[in-house]
Amino acid sequence: MPSLKEIKERITSIKSTQKITSAMKMLASSKLKKAQYQMNCFLPYQRKLNAMLNSFLFCITDFKSDLTKKREIKRIALVIFSSNTSLCGTFNSNIIKLFNETISKYRYLNQKDIEVYTVGKKIEDYVRKLTFPLKVEGNYTQLIEKPNFARLKQLADKLLSDFLNQKIDKVELLYNHCKNAIFQTTNLEPYLPIQMKQPKSTSHADYIIEPDRDTVLNTLILRSLYSKIYAVLLNSVIAEHTARLVSMQIAIDNADEILEELTIQHNKQRQQTITNDLLDIISSSEALK
């Protein structure tokens, strides 16, 4: 049985750890609220933009764009979103699992024909340590801490340029999506070529487009692509902070349970020590009579 000193040391150690997890929980909560605010401000714009674009393309059936053309897949680019740090539950392991499944899906391609863009230090470290070489393109880990539309636009422009120049034939986005505080999903979404959805309303409107149809539609397509990858980044950041918030709360609850057990154990041990001391005093007193 541990001594009183050992129990006190464990209690002190757990309380110290609990302070750290509480601070991390507060920090995760603050970052989560900030990311949710960014998403809430951005989401109406993205939805309206996509609805407008889909409506135009549904009505203008003869419009053609190189960004919508499907080609035989000979070279692919994967953009994977993870976190920069740990202590966020299964957040990173889930995205790594999805990445491995995706790589297996394209095993018919040569390794040099798979480009990997990592947005997050954890997935970057994992890819660099693989036994088979996959080239990591660019450095975008800073976007996780500070989501920046302009910086992410540079990545989107690189992907667009490579796709239009037929250096790659397909682009896919891999990320975590937070449905609620308990449930998260790993998503794989096609990015290029563009896949347009049919609008809910099937009525054909007679649009007057200025300055000209192609200029407006190409601009809308580009903005839609920029907004999509930015929304994916914000989704991943929200999922990360939610996972960390839940993990820290679980750690705090576990610490409370252990502290309760140790406190009971400490009190019992202390009571036993006092009882033994009293018995020794009584025994000594009886012996002196």
Swiss-Prot record:
The keyword Membrane applies. Its main location: membrane. One of its GO terms (molecular function) is ATP binding. GO terms for biological process: proton motive force-driven plasma membrane ATP synthesis. GO terms for cellular component: plasma membrane; proton-transporting ATP synthase complex. InterPro entries: ATP_synth_F1_ATPase_gsu, ATP_synth_F1_gsu. SUPFAM superfamilies: ATP synthase (F1-ATPase), gamma subunit (SSF52943). It is found in: Cell inner membrane. Coiled coil: none annotated. The keyword Iron-sulfur does not apply. Keywords: ATP synthesis, Cell inner membrane, Cell membrane, CF(1), Hydrogen ion transport, Ion transport, Membrane, Transport. It holds the Pfam family ATP-synt. It is a peripheral membrane protein. Produces ATP from ADP in the presence of a proton gradient across the membrane. The gamma chain is believed to be important in regulating ATPase activity and the flow of protons through the CF(0) complex. F-type ATPases have 2 components, CF(1) - the catalytic core - and CF(0) - the membrane proton channel. CF(1) has five subunits: alpha(3), beta(3), gamma(1), delta(1), epsilon(1). CF(0) has three main subunits: a, b and c. Belongs to the ATPase gamma chain family. This is ATP synthase gamma chain. It comes from Azobacteroides pseudotrichonymphae genomovar. CFP2.
